[in-house]
């Protein structure tokens, strides 16, 4: 597999956690949280990040119930993933995000989850599924 830069998104209607990673290092790290009231502002900032980091692929967390079923937030995450692909022509992968906020809380040692850390957890899970070179 060729080296790729990846951006991951923990999508929420009020804020979006973003992480960055690389298939060569197989490491993900939190990048930032977008707090934007409007869709235009959100996608404007995402466009800036895409231009800055030049990722080959995006990973979007897919919220599922504990038993693996889709829920109302799943449709919103899928719509966001489709918008990323449609607006920016970016390849997008959906990844089960169950437990990512709890894992982020454990990593931070706090009860408040950081959405960028949750995005890094989601991206790390994706990187861990890739075949070894």
UniProtKB/Swiss-Prot annotation:
It holds the Pfam family RuvX. It is found in: Cytoplasm. GO terms for cellular component: cytosol. Keywords: Cytoplasm, Hydrolase, Nuclease, Ribosome biogenesis. One of its GO terms (molecular function) is nuclease activity. It is an enzyme of class 3 (hydrolase). Belongs to the YqgF nuclease family. HAMAP family: Nuclease_YqgF. This is Putative pre-16S rRNA nuclease.
């Amino acid at each position: 597999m060729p080296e790729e830069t990846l951006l991951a998104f923990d999508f929420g209607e009020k804020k979006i956690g973003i992480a960055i990673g690389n298939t060569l290092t197989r490491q993900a790290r939190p990048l930032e949280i977008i707090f934007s009231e409007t869709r235009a502002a959100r996608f404007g900032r995402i466009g800036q990040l895409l231009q800055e980091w030049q990722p080959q692929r995006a990973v979007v967390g897919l919220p599922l119930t504990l038993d693996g079923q889709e829920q109302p937030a799943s449709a919103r995450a899928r719509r966001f993933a489709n918008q990323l692909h449609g607006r920016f022509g970016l390849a997008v992968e959906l990844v089960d995000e169950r437990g990512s906020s709890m894992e982020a809380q454990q990593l931070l040692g706090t009860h408040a989850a950081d959405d960028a850390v949750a995005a890094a957890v989601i991206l790390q899970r994706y990187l861990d599924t890739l075949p070894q070179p």
